[in-house]
């Protein structure tokens, strides 16, 4: 009886950590922490991003955002674009790379009619900041019928 090798589960976070490991002095250690799924306290930027996405999701689910809210303008604009989309869509897809079975695992922020959106919260805007992110290619592989992918 032969034993079949386990599929390796790969997330966009792991791919991004691997890519990051080549860019900084302690990038490899950061990658190992991600690989070991070590919990780290969230940074202020991470907490702000989570709060922003929660407010956006609440508005998409019918909540009214007060006009004096600091994010009123951008949340109103984004919620109009994302209206009718599925939120937090978890997907898995098996692929084979070099004879090794791999399970791609992604959680798409928003999906509607072949369009994927990923919400990125930042205090500063840099055009094409995520253009070469491994997340783009991976999510387009997860949703092969997707026509495009937008970071918002």
Language model: regions and residue ranges:
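Metal-dependent nuclease catalytic cores that hydrolyze phosphodiester bonds in DNA/RNA
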Residues: 1-108
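Mg2+/Mn2+-dependent nuclease catalytic core
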Residues: 89-152
């Amino acid at each position: 009886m032969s034993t079949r090798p386990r599929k390796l589960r790969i997330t966009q976070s792991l791919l991004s950590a691997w890519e990051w490991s080549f860019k900084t002095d302690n990038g490899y250690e950061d990658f190992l922490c991600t690989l070991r799924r070590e919990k780290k306290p969230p940074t202020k930027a991470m907490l702000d991003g989570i709060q922003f996405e929660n407010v956006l999701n609440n508005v998409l689910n019918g909540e009214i955002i007060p006009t004096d809210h600091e994010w009123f303008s951008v949340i109103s604009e984004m919620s109009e674009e994302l209206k009718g989309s599925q939120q937090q869509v978890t997907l898995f897809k098996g692929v084979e790379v070099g004879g090794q079975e791999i399970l791609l695992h992604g959680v798409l922020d928003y999906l509607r009619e072949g369009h994927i959106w990923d919400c990125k919260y930042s205090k500063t805007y840099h055009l094409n900041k995520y253009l070469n992110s491994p997340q783009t290619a991976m999510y387009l592989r997860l949703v092969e019928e997707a026509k495009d992918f937008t970071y918002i």
